[in-house]
Amino acid sequence: GVRYTMLMAFGRFLLQCAYYTPYNPAMSYQVLARKYRPASFQDLEGQEHVLQALINALDNERLHHAYLFTGTRGVGKTTIARIFAKCLNCEQGVTSEPCGTCSSCVEISEGRSVDLIEVDAASRTGVDDMRDLLDNVQYLPTASRFKVYLIDEVHMLSKSSFNAMLKTLEEPPAYAIFILATTERHKILPTILSRCQVFTFNRISVADTIKHLKGIGASEDLVMEDEALHVIAQKADGALRDALSIFDQMVSICGDKHIRYADVVKNLNVLDYDYYFKITDVFSTQNVGDVLLVFDEILSNGFDGQIFLNGLANHFRDLMVGRNPETVKL
């Protein structure tokens, strides 16, 4: 019985080998947000105030031991942190323009640098996890100039974990640099804030988002309607990563490498621009019943109410600005 079972198992193994198709990396699809992740400060859109401060610190070698990057999701906090780690550990020396080709730069880009320790605080909230991390700080970098600790969603740490960090943040080894990232600055203890240089990341403007999408679209040989990109940028609400996810989705939906305004409006369930002019006409009649009927039609069709109100406010603003040529620059 045992021999028969072993023979059957071996037979199944041979069948699996016969039908096994080796993994081919060229066949795997890489999402656009990862494929076009910026590799240097020059590749980034927006956050000029943050970039200039970091570039000055690198060029003048006035490095702080702890940084706090705060801002909404998808605005470049972890991306800039990784580029900053490259700048610190590039084999050409501390520089604001890392080579991108040395072993240190390549390892950081590929996410396998042993001296860039990335921690997801949301899944390691306990004080014991923090103590394990801090115990690691006492050891010298394995192959780099600095050990960089990138703690994402740091606001998720417990109060005990924050307290355990205080001493290390105040007097870290010369080779250790901490970069804390959060979307909720108000949850960070004041004692932590006082030990960090704090950089507030802004939402990415619609213009910068469209510029970035156009660059990627050109690299992917896509045909893009400007109105379609404008809707995507508005829907992303300043989060460039969200814009790239929506853009990626639309590339898959359209299929023919043509991103059309009509397809974007339909699939993102947002109002066509012409609809706002229809609403304006209804308002001009000052008939409350007609206005309520239009609103009911919009909501019953499943349109996002908040996005509709934001779009309506922008529409009326554009109309008022358009009435006076001197205010167009606004």
Predicted regions and their residues:
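P-loop/Walker A NTP-binding region and its immediately flanking N-terminal helices
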Residues: 2-198, 208, 216
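Extended, largely alpha-helical regulatory/partner-binding modules appended to the mid-to-C-terminal parts
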Residues: 86, 110-114, 129-132, 145, ...
